[in-house]
């Protein structure tokens, strides 16, 4: 396919136009009085949202050279969303400001590589200053404040604070759609996975259609169990111990299943068979988690354990197990607290090392099941469009809150960045590197300026007033007052603010050092078709 080549000013100009198109669309959503954007997504569905990354993902520009600029900023928003879960609009505004200032300086003859070094040094200095200013999220009220600011809804803040209160900082909080109006919070204690009983004969409570085993032994088996002869020696030992048995295996079938069912119906002893969750390596990992949680060993030929040779020592225990048609919950497994902590540390290390979002999500689910439990927030609304918008806001608020618990909070409303930019005063840079740092200093005021502009105030005036206020004070765009933001509960997670700045600077550094771009040449339309289309109707003058 033939390519189009653009060089120097033409190339950078096209990239800047692309950046501006995307950023101008996203930045109208910034702040408590930011507006929404209506998106026509694939299949002509309509989404209304004020979530920066959702808007950015939908934008593809017609001009291919400009589209490259837009895609670079989309990367800023997406990366910030992956790391911190919020702050995507702030990141986009920062990127736009740095691109605009940076390209102006490049056009005036500054050295792009020196600018990039200056930008990087400035970002590190501001980032360190933000961390130094951050304070821990201590109370449930502060957690509620973070979530309220992110979702712009106090009811959401209260529900999320309750959820974190129950599951702790490593717990999983999932957001699901509900058929009823409003918000509901449900809590699942213990380890739950989405596989139910293999046969309905195992049910112990016919009214609720579930099997409940108190103080059971738990057998974890990696393969299928189909031959009763392999199984019977272990079953006899369990019957003698007088406790029920939960069997988790790839499958239980044939004679083995019949043996369990017959004994259950006769009342000889109570058991439930469940298929292991996941498949392949993930199934192995989840069985390993259950083994640690219950104090069991996974029976598998790989580790030299055969079903017909093992005794009670390979079985795990739990206070109780509840199995429904669709899921199994193990409450208070008998594993040692130390082993569970080791396993949690191991999974945390894997989360830090992985590049794949999907893997990270699955690892975090496993971590939560071991560490705390799972809270489910159900959200409902009158229409599909409103439901989507609410769900977006809730997911963002959960991410922002988790970020706040991890690294702490700073004053919100764009003022923390502005105040932290005073860290650049002590940087001893010269020449174009100093110019690079001043680009970051100017950009650091932009989020505050747009929060003010979107609320109908004069942005530059607000910025110069806030600059003179003490750290932690700033502009409350909701009321138009200059006040102590932290005391008012207007706070941002420092991780969100830092990620926004770091990711914006990373892409801008690359964009400034661009000297040429190569894009596919659009296919020519046949001449006649174009003419007929354009001049089909001649109006009399």
Curated annotation (Swiss-Prot):
- Write one Gene Ontology MF term: ATP binding
Matching entries from InterPro entries are given as: Chaperonin_Cpn60_CS, Cpn60/GroEL, Cpn60/GroEL/TCP-1, GroEL-like_apical_dom_sf, GROEL-like_equatorial_sf, TCP-1-like_intermed_sf
Q: Biological process (GO) annotations?
A: protein refolding
Per UniProt, the enzyme's principal EC class comes to: isomerase
Q: What is its main location?
A: cytoplasm
EC number(s) reported in the record: 5.6.1.7
**Which Pfam families does the record associate with it?**
Cpn60_TCP1 (PF00118)
- Which cell locations does it reside in? Cytoplasm
Q: Where does ATP bind?
A: 29-32, 86-90, 413, 492
Keyword Chaperone recorded: yes
Give me the reactions it catalyses. ATP + H2O + a folded polypeptide = ADP + phosphate + an unfolded polypeptide
In terms of Gene3D superfamilies, this protein maps to: GroEL (3.50.7.10), GroEL-like equatorial domain (1.10.560.10), TCP-1-like chaperonin intermediate domain (3.30.260.10)
Q: Cellular component per GO?
A: cytoplasm
Role of this protein: Together with its co-chaperonin GroES, plays an essential role in assisting protein folding. The GroEL-GroES system forms a nano-cage that allows encapsulation of the non-native substrate proteins and provides a physical environment optimized to promote and accelerate protein folding.
Homology family = Belongs to the chaperonin (HSP60) family.
Q: How does it assemble?
A: Forms a cylinder of 14 subunits composed of two heptameric rings stacked back-to-back. Interacts with the co-chaperonin GroES.
Its name, as the record gives it, is Chaperonin GroEL 2
